[in-house]
A protein has these predicted regions:
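Domain-terminus/edge residues, biased toward the C-terminal soluble/receptor-binding domains
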Residues: 54-55, 67-169
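Active-site-adjacent loops and short helices of periplasmic peptidoglycan-processing enzymes
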Residues: 1-74, 84
Length: 169
């Protein structure tokens, strides 16, 4: 997110770099802004994922950079299904090609933005996890939703399209 120390952005504004470009500093800024404090924010993140049934997900930090952050494809499926049902506006942010707020412009690197079937998702990368992604598509006459979740992929985009193609056979 290229945030500067002392810069003031609203939590809602921080969602754009966090979801569009996986901004670690934005995620940490949201955690720091939480009134009881960062540690309580992370604790609440863990309580929340457990409350929706994502029992094998654990957050050590807000940004996702710690190797102690863990999840599974099944848990990520539970989380994205919750988002789709309860807060689909989050996905709208992931569909933006770019967003400018004051002096910042963030450009979404997702290669699926030009596909009309793509309805949103989130990419990530750490050396331990390699490239990860959750990608959602609405396809077919009945606009059925398909999710492709990749963990540890070195070819994230082509793997996503290959798996989606396989699911549609």
């Amino acid at each position: 997110g290229n945030l500067r120390f002392g810069e003031k952005l609203r939590v809602g504004e921080l969602m754009y770099p966090m979801l569009m470009v996986s901004s670690n500093d934005s995620a940490e800024a949201v955690a720091q802004a939480y009134d009881p404090g960062r540690d309580k924010f992370i604790k609440e993140m863990n309580i929340w994922v457990n409350s929706i049934g994502a029992y094998r997900t654990y957050f050590k930090d807000a940004s996702g950079l710690s190797p102690q952050n863990v999840s599974t494809a099944q848990d990520l499926s539970i989380i994205i299904q919750w988002v789709l049902k309860n807060d689909p506006e989050i996905l709208d942010i992931t569909l933006l090609k770019s967003k400018t707020i004051r002096t910042h412009t963030w450009t979404n690197p997702t290669h699926f933005l030009n596909l009309t079937s793509y309805i949103g998702g989130k990419n990530g990368y750490t050396p331990e996890a390699d490239r990860t992604s959750v990608s959602l598509f609405k396809i077919g006459k009945y606009k059925r939703t398909y999710g492709v979740i990749l963990l540890g992929s070195s070819q994230r985009d082509s793997d996503t399209l290959d798996l989606l193609d396989e699911a549609l056979r």
